[in-house]
Amino acid sequence: MCPTLNNIVSSLQRNGIFINSLIAALTIGGQQLFSSSTFSCPCQVGKNFYYGSAFLVIPALILLVAGFALRSQMWTITGEYCCSCAPPYRRISPLECKLACLRFFSITGRAVIAPLTWLAVTLLTGTYYECAASEFASVDHYPMFDNVSASKREEILAGFPCCRSAPSDVILVRDEIALLHRYQSQMLGWILITLATIAALVSCCVAKCCSPLTSLQHCYWTSHLQNERELFEQAAEQHSRLLMMHRIKKLFGFIPGSEDVKHIRIPSCQDWKDISVPTLLCMGDDLQGHYSFLGNRVDEDNEEDRSRGIELKP
């Protein structure tokens, strides 16, 4: 990928409006595809409500959970600030708590975009609501239902979403009820959009007012977090690879990929036993804890390597 394209992709990734719009567009497309391919109202008493409500609410809940779960910052906050198993020596300053709350509100704002978009689109479409509310429609003012029992009335109403061929008077009632439900559903959709917009505006204002950072400081802090994550991942990958090459060479006597292997080491039975049980990463009071399966065995002959580092020879 050329540097110019890399810069464009990087700038788009940091543009919150673009990311939010992309999430909303993908949610709308997914909802339309999902609705056209999977939704089919059962048109039975007692099932319409649960079926329509499930298609309306459950995907929104799944999108909400996924919105939190797919954000790496969410797991960072959970592990560093919320986990009760965190090391006792880790002290958190008030400023750090405020910044963590600010990050959490930012994550929440991004996570609720997809479920709110799903709810708004489904309500504006009205298909799920029409199925769920069909058997609860009020038809007392229609003469054709005067001599119909309550159970029969519910059965007729439940079949309206699937009714294709029927007497003209029934079709007239069905169309009027469908328009009423469509009206109610779309009104709820617009109310949801209005409330979500107001809530987003108020939340942004409150976050800016309560933030310990100025506008420029927040911009710098956001860039700092992104660069910190990118550079750490790059350095960690290179560091772990070099460290593992060093330990593999100690265990087997050569490095994978070497063209002129003149000497190999045969691991003993004790070597295999020692590297079969993994150790945890720097847990407890031992800040110089081992990092991998190979850490127990191959470094025990030189404990000073951890403090002074490892010399990498060509």
UniProtKB/Swiss-Prot annotation:
Assigned GO CC terms: plasma membrane
Expression tissues: Placenta.
Keywords, in A-Z order: Cell membrane, Disulfide bond, Ion channel, Ion transport, Membrane, Transmembrane, Transmembrane helix, Transport
Transmembrane segments: 15-37, 49-71, 104-129, 184-207
Ranges in the topological domain labelled Cytoplasmic: 1-14, 72-103, 208-314
Annotated localization: Cell membrane
Domain of life: Eukaryota
Broad class of where this protein is predominantly found: membrane
Extracellular side: 38-48, 130-183
InterPro entries tied to this protein: CALHM
Single GO BP term: ATP export
UniProt membrane topology term: Multi-pass membrane protein
Cystine pairings recorded for this chain: 41-131, 43-162
Pfam families: Ca_hom_mod
Record-level Gene Ontology MF annotations: monoatomic cation channel activity
Oligomeric form and interacting partners: Oligomerizes to form decameric and undecameric channels. Two hemichannels can assemble in a tail-to-tail manner to form a gap junction.
Annotated family: Belongs to the CALHM family.
Function: May assemble to form gap junction channel-like structures involved in intercellular communication. Channel gating and ion conductance are likely regulated by membrane lipids rather than by membrane depolarization or extracellular calcium levels.
Full protein name: Calcium homeostasis modulator protein 4
